[in-house]
Amino acid sequence: MTNFTTSTPHDALFKSFLMHPDTARDFMEIHLPKDLRELCDLDSLKLESASFVDEKLRALHSDILWSVKTREGDGYIYVVIEHQSREDIHMAFRLMRYSMAVMQRHIEHDKRRPLPLVIPMLFYHGSRSPYPWSLCWLDEFADPTTARKLYNAAFPLVDITVVPDDEIVQHRRVALLELIQKHIRQRDLMGLIDQLVVLLVTECANDSQITALLNYILLTGDEERFNEFISELTSRMPQHRERIMTIAERIHNDDCRANS
């Protein structure tokens, strides 16, 4: 008799059946929605490890995970079958987490691989009937309408590489960050002096942010021209010369200690 490490006898019985390929094939042929079933080559069923570890290193475990080839033979589909003897208001979100974990593992060894379809299925036989909760995870939000707009569309993108500099300098306290990170790969940042002076004069960054900014330029930009860059910057804004030179000297000393 096969032993399963499970929390309940319900789980043990469920696994003893659904981990058998012929039984799993019958289950999917009967219960998978027709349009999804037609995508799957159920003769290619392969049992996969259903244990995962998420980013916080906590065990994430689903009951049963099968992979199948597509009928076109150009990819894989995974079917997650979760067993529940009690209803769970957040079951849909839990199934989404399982699905994301399967997708992550699929692309771990080759980031260029397309994401696989993962079909989550819930087998329920609890005392409360019918199953009382939606299995659309978007319904779990307090505002499902906004959740659908957010998660069914492309996410907001701030592509600073296509934003004109004249527009960036109007972005108040985030302008320095955006301007430098847009142009850092030029290596020579001397052409940005005029715009940087305007932003620094308006006190759009505190000492901590200016320190981080200059350190970033030293580490990522043209190190050989850093002193020239600082000299030109301070010559354009003599009222801030002492402040900037103090920060630059501290960065230089820290860099020397790190390299000694």
Swiss-Prot record:
This is Recombination-promoting nuclease RpnD. A low activity DNA endonuclease probably yielding 3'-hydroxyl ends. Involved in RecA-independent recombination and horizontal gene transfer. Belongs to the Rpn/YhgA-like nuclease family. The keyword Phosphoprotein does not apply. Coiled coil: none annotated. It comes from Escherichia coli O157:H7. Keywords: DNA recombination, Endonuclease, Hydrolase, Magnesium, Nuclease. The gene is rpnD. It is an enzyme of class 3 (hydrolase). GO terms for molecular function: double-stranded DNA endonuclease activity. PANTHER family: INACTIVE RECOMBINATION-PROMOTING NUCLEASE-LIKE PROTEIN RPNE-RELATED, PTHR34611. One of its GO terms (biological process) is DNA recombination. Its EC number is 3.1.21.-. It comes from the Bacteria.
